From Swiss-Prot:
Reactions that this protein is recorded to catalyse: tRNA(Lys) + L-lysine + ATP = L-lysyl-tRNA(Lys) + AMP + diphosphate
Protein's GO biological process: lysyl-tRNA aminoacylation
Organism, as annotated: Actinobacillus pleuropneumoniae serotype 7 (strain AP76)
Main location (coarse class): cytoplasm
Keyword Lipoprotein applies: no
Gene3D superfamilies per record: Bira Bifunctional Protein, Domain 2, Nucleic acid-binding proteins
Descriptive protein name: Lysine--tRNA ligase
Top-level taxonomy: Bacteria, Pseudomonadati, Pseudomonadota, Gammaproteobacteria, Pasteurellales
Amino-acid positions noted as binding Mg(2+) 2 in the UniProt annotation, renumbered to this chain: E418
Free-text cofactor note: Binds 3 Mg(2+) ions per subunit.
Amino acid sequence: MSEVEHQELDLNGEMLARREKLAKLREQGNPFPNTFRRDAYAEKLHAQYDEVEGEALKEQDIQVKVAGRIMLKRVMGKASFFTIQDVSGQIQLYVARDNLAEGVYADKVSMWDLGDIVGAAGTLFKTKTGELTVRCSEVELLTKSLRPLPNKVQGLTDQETRYRQRYLDLISNEESRRTFMIRSKMVSGIRQFFLEKDFIEVETPMLQVIPGGAAAKPFITHHNALDVDMYLRIAPELYLKRLVVGGFERVFELNRNFRNEGVSVRHNPEFTMIEYYQAYADYHDLMDNTEELLRKLAIDILGTTTVPYGEYVFDFGKPFERITMHDAIVKYGNGITREDLDSFEKSVEIAKGLGIEIQKSWGLGSVVNAIFEEVAEHQLIQPTFLMAHPAEISPLARRNDENPEVTDRFELFIGGREIGNGFSELNDAEDQAERFDAQVAAKDAGDDEAMFKDEDFVVALEHGLPPTAGEGLGIDRLAMIFANAPSIRDVILFPAMRQK
């Protein structure tokens, strides 16, 4: 018999034994009671009483009601120790036959297994080893677990199982619970940051007739009642800018986007972003905003502006570097000159030498961008704003007044990865229409990620968009940094997985 077959046999036997216990418990009443009114959490109890001496604790006679999942169990005849886990941490229970009502220990507590959820009321005390413990006078089974937990020594270590059965991961791994608590705190902090700056939070369509706001492949669906193909949004940008046209001068949306592309340690087809727009501001203002936001998040979440991530330590306390795309290539490109990047023929030659496959629809701007991604992107380790992107690859960004071939745009890179993208918005309706036409031509030439033309958005611009800047920040990638997580799947509760 194989190891897998042995494990399946053991599992089946364990589940059968638990179901038999459940049947006996049903004879005594409902083993799934509706409520238990607890008044204490493990973390707060430890914070308040871990340093209190045993005698002093006994004199205080502190009564508590706790609840949680059984993670450890030690049976010693007429008494047992259980370690239960709630959302905040773990606390030990001392359950003795003589401290409970008659028959409770033999008929009920004896049926408890690892993974069961229980409630207990009693008095705090310290064991001989000094561990804070609840001496239970009342106990109640709240939920019977029919499946055993992962091995209590090894925990849940299989990565794929952790992603597919996130509930087991959260039960078994404190680090995973910490990761998602960090993410939650980060999201709350971001929302509060913008609300305090007088932004209003809005919601824009997830289903769109024309997907826009980014260069990406959309998911396609069909609306039966309207008999029209629709797309899951790739970005909320064009709708948010319509709102600025309408007079909402500071707006943000913190929500999901969808892109029908590859899955990797940095990419999930369903992901979270905050996108915000500020009238009467430019891209320099947004870079300042971003520095302020990340510095505040680091302090609020980690208590410091130095953020460890893998082999790196990011410094959010000092001003972020600001460098143009062309200067970054010259800096890291091993002899590539600015003059090289001004020549289409020379840039193509350099790109081919780097193994880059040139697309038919590419102009000079796309070639230069591909060279940057190959030679410089991975070098931007400390927080860096990359600026002055070619207009060709920035169809929604405002052209730079001094050099119309590039735009007033920035991307935020941390650890060699893009975290955010922002720019002074293009508010010239005629220029926008021309750039949409160029995107349509690129799509016709085979570029699946080129943008659709949104005529209604052009009409909105014709009514007048004030000088505006906007930015999108990837929530998942930011969470990776603050939680020191190597994969985007580690910070998404239920990441996309191939079906078994």
